[in-house]
Each structure stands twice: as structure tokens, then as C-alpha cells.
């Protein structure tokens, strides 16, 4: 999983996934260098901000929002709040 500081310019430069014959890869993740646990999921048709944290060996991942509907800065703030809730043991799926 590549790591980079998620900015508008960098996100715009990341291409959507192209379907290739025989490939089962349908998504790619990019981690943010500024906020551990925050990242971008790229598919064939969308770029989604995600937050993820491993708790007791189980990976918890949630979608923060879709780019460009929300900016990287807005998504980073939401992700920071979500990571805080996860650290406190609050269920983010409720």
C-alpha cells in the first residue's frame, strides 16, 4: 500500500483502476503520511476516503466520504474524530 500526503493535486494524479484480463484486483489503497489510519481507496469508478484501525487483531475500516465531494482536509478531520472514537472503544458503525 503506497504512502503519501493526500492532497487534491496528488489525488487527482492517481488514476482510476483499469480492468485487466485475468486480474482480480478491484481496489487499491493509499495511506496518508500526515494521519496514520487515514487513506484513500481507489476503484474503477471512485476515489473514497477511508479510516482504518486494527483493534485486538481485527481491522476496522469505514468510509469517510467520496472525493471530490469532500476535500482531503475535511476528510482528514472526520477521520481524526473517527480514530478518536475507535481508540475510546466507541462503535463507529452504530
Go through the PLM ranges and name each one.
Residues 1-94:
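Basic/aromatic DNA-contact patch characteristic of tyrosine site-specific recombinases
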